[in-house]
Amino acid sequence: MMWTKPEVTEMRFGFEVTMYVCNR
């Protein structure tokens, strides 16, 4: 992912957090 849009970054961050919580 080479996007530099803040919206995309926020979405990706939220997605990573969700995956982390699901993997716990």
Swiss-Prot record:
Source organism, top-level taxon: Bacteria
Keyword terms, alphabetized: PQQ biosynthesis
InterPro entries assigned to the protein according to its UniProt record, in alphabetical order: PQQ_synth_PqqA
Short name of any one Pfam family annotated for the protein: PqqA
Disulfide bridges in this chain: none
Pathway assigned in UniProt: Cofactor biosynthesis; pyrroloquinoline quinone biosynthesis
Covalent link (Pyrroloquinoline quinone (Glu-Tyr)) residue numbers: E16-Y20
Gene Ontology BP terms: pyrroloquinoline quinone biosynthetic process
Function, as annotated: Required for coenzyme pyrroloquinoline quinone (PQQ) biosynthesis. PQQ is probably formed by cross-linking a specific glutamate to a specific tyrosine residue and excising these residues from the peptide.
Homology family: Belongs to the PqqA family.
Name the record gives this protein: Coenzyme PQQ synthesis protein A
Annotated organism of origin: Methylobacillus flagellatus
Lineage, uppermost ranks: Bacteria, Pseudomonadati, Pseudomonadota, Betaproteobacteria, Nitrosomonadales
